[in-house]
Amino acid sequence: MPSFHDFRFLSTDGKHKVFARECTPDGEVRAVLQIAHGVAEHIYRYAPFMEFLANHGFVVVANDHLGHGKTAENEQELCFFAEKDGWNDVVSDMDQLHKLTAAKYPDVPYFLFGHSMGSFLTRTYIIDHPEGLKGGIISGTGQNPAAVVAAGKLMAKLEMIDNGPMYHSPTLDKLAFGSYNKKYDHVRTKLDWRTRDEAIVDQYIADPLCGAMATAGIFHDMMGGLQYIW
């Protein structure tokens, strides 16, 4: 059966120890898949998916981004990348994991999978580091009009000026996610939009490393990332 191995490496920011996982198959390796997770979650949520792929011959690796999961050093850091240039730090950490893993499995195809915010990071990565990738898989992505993104970035900047980049902003969080449940007639929780599987919704809500309110800093970073991949 597949086996998991947890490890850490030094982030590009020079301060944090990035938490990462590798799931390896019990048998021949067909390919490698690297996962970039979404905002306000962490890689342990992907364990069943990683194990499923490993059962089909994939080595699967993933890391908790800065400000997420076990890479975050405290609750205040959740949903916060960095004081400056956080988006590029996170992409560079993904590149570090790619290089570490590709060196171990140099003779098989290497794929990058990104979900939600991870899809934006993956699109950035493909622009900046296309070498060594066989392909990219984009899940739960999107692209708002340029004017909307610019306005969101400005609002985040103003929030940073008023309250600091680590401020967990109810205003920005509502703007980003507040309308998602409106698409459904009957909702049980404010996070029903995440999945139709009620058990998974409940697990997410109960997880202290999931669902942190977006900080002004990460919102500003994401808007900058969206402008870059436009």
Question: Which functions belong to the PLM regions below?
Answer:
Residues T124-L209:
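Alpha/beta-hydrolase-fold enzymes
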